[in-house]
Amino acid sequence: MCRGCRKCHETAECSILDDTKKLMAEYEWADKIVSVSPSYWADIPGQFKVFIDRCTPWCNTHEPHAKISGGKKGYTIALRTGPSMPECEKIIGSIEHFYGHLEIEASGKLGLCKVEHKEDVAARTEEIQEFCEGICRN
């Protein structure tokens, strides 16, 4: 969890030794990044937020900052149990905000409401496949 020490604002590196660098190496390797998030009280889960906070060394709002290579495309899928698409849009907005600070182009999004059980996802297979095929085409 980010401690707010701001060392990364001076060195572009974090003082915490965990797997964040390994995960960011995967981001560096990838051309396309797909983030999928359920709704936890109308936003991304705490674990996802902790990861985003830990990516501060790569955030383009301060210099120096670590960088991943450009030209990456980011896609987002948000799921929630309720019927309100604005809640999915809030989740998508949080993830696209994260992408923006890593200079990843937000290139597609899918919000899935009324998803509580596996069967609810299975009923949306065609919609999900179309979204995934779009990722492959772009």
Locations of regions flagged by a protein language model:
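N-terminal beta1-alpha1-beta2 submodule of the flavodoxin-like/Rossmannoid cofactor-binding fold
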Residues: 1-60, 100, 107-138
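Short, glycine-/small-residue-rich phosphate/pyrophosphate-handling segment
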Residues: 63-108
